[in-house]
Amino acid sequence: MTEETVQPLIEFKNVSLDYGETKVLKKVDLEIEEGKFYTLLGPSGSGKSTILSLISGRLQPTGGDILIEGKNVNSLPSNQRKVNTVFQNYALFPNMNVYDNVAFGPSIKGFSKKKIDQLVKSMLKLVKLDDFSDREISEISGGQQQRVAIARALANQPKVLLLDEPLSALDYKLRKEMQSELRELQQRLGITFIFVTHDQEEALAMSDWIFVINDGKVEQSGSPVDIYDEPINHFVANFIGEANIVPGVMKEDYLVSFAGKDFKNVDAGMRTNERVEVVIRPEDLDIVVPSRGKLQVTIEDQSFRGDSYEITAIDDAGNEWAVQATNPAKIGQRRGLKFDPEDIHIMRLNESEEDFDARLESYEGED
Ligand SMILES: Nc1ncnc2c1ncn2[C@@H]1O[C@H](COP(=O)(O)OP(=O)(O)OP(=O)(O)O)[C@@H](O)[C@H]1O
């Protein structure tokens, strides 16, 4: 039986964008399905907003193809795409009240007054601003402005909502609140959200699927859990959460050597004695008495994080380990580090997802 393939809502095939000599996007492939929450996560300048501009039609690619519902839209104007964007600065009309801001899109489309009214009221209800219709934009808070911007975009009834760092102007608490509100809104509406952020915590908390973008390329894509637990390379491991990354050698299947010792692990399929990078997350390390530790360390530093202590320890081979611990430690003390085989994650050196797959295929072909 063949599995039915779902046509992606949006596809990027080998999409490049150059500004003269500057290559901003380098042969990007993406697939976006209907009804999910996607996040483009990457550092400043990596090309996230450029990808949104290509989806919305504000920019055209210099190479490759962009497809929406299977049709090439490389040169389809923005206003003919069922896509709307919520910008970082909200871009609200300051001279209009809340109601008129939301009514703007539907009025341009020539809908009847009654239909516009219904639409605006339901959108304002959706973002919990039904009592704020008559307020001027200057009379509402940042978080409320953010909601108006979302209601305004949704009033255009898009298939896809693009959100370009929409929470970055909010304070920590409001930002957290809006994260769950946005997530809930997306689930309720069932439309596709593509959210841009450089905040990994935000991406992990909100998304069904994350694209990690770096230097105009997709470094890795996957569910938040996949990306956190199985980062494909040094960049992703470092960018997504805190990671201890030390050099190692895969001696054989399920046996890795690092910090001068051999450890059982759960990875297989690499060459004998292949050089690798070993990743262990700070929360997967426990500080114990030296005799119970798999590695012996000296406590170098510690800082209080509110709900935990971040401890820095140095092993006898000179590797530095960040440990997230519930109890404080004493600087200068000799301790042990404990971890389980499944907490050891192995990364091949400088390997892209494509190279990794190609190598895996050739490995499987050798049987
Ligand atoms: N008109 C332009 N000419 C030349 N380079 C440009 C132009 N517009 C953008 N760039 C470059 O393209 C790169 C990607 O920009 P983009 O805005 O997509 O990044 P980003 O990941 O969204 O960053 P941020 O998180 O800071 O918004 C940047 O290095 C930027 O300097």
Swiss-Prot record:
Subcellular localization, as worded in the UniProt entry: Cell membrane
Role of this protein: Part of the ABC transporter complex PotABCD involved in spermidine/putrescine import. Responsible for energy coupling to the transport system.
Designated gene of the protein: potA
Domain ABC transporter: start-end pairs: 10-240
Membrane topology reported for the UniProt record: Peripheral membrane protein
Molecular function per GO: ABC-type polyamine transporter activity; ATP binding; ATP hydrolysis activity
Catalyzed chemical reaction(s): ATP + H2O + polyamine-[polyamine-binding protein]Side 1 = ADP + phosphate + polyamineSide 2 + [polyamine-binding protein]Side 1
Assembly: The complex is composed of two ATP-binding proteins (PotA), two transmembrane proteins (PotB and PotC) and a solute-binding protein (PotD).
InterPro entries found in the cross-reference section: AAA+_ATPase (IPR003593), ABC_SmlMolc_Importer (IPR050093), ABC_transporter-like_ATP-bd (IPR003439), ABC_transporter-like_CS (IPR017871), Mo/tungstate-bd_C_term_dom (IPR008995), P-loop_NTPase (IPR027417), Transp-assoc_OB_typ2 (IPR013611)
GO cellular component: ATP-binding cassette (ABC) transporter complex
Enzyme Commission number(s) from the entry: 7.6.2.11
Keyword tags: ATP-binding, Cell membrane, Membrane, Nucleotide-binding, Translocase, Transport
List of residues binding ATP: G42, P43, S44, G45, S46, G47, K48, S49
Chief subcellular location: membrane
Keyword Nucleotide-binding (UniProt): yes
Record-linked PANTHER family: SPERMIDINE/PUTRESCINE IMPORT ATP-BINDING PROTEIN POTA, SPERMIDINE_PUTRESCINE IMPORT ATP-BINDING PROTEIN POTA
Recorded family membership: Belongs to the ABC transporter superfamily. Spermidine/putrescine importer (TC 3.A.1.11.1) family.
Protein name in UniProt: Spermidine/putrescine import ATP-binding protein PotA
Keyword Transport: yes
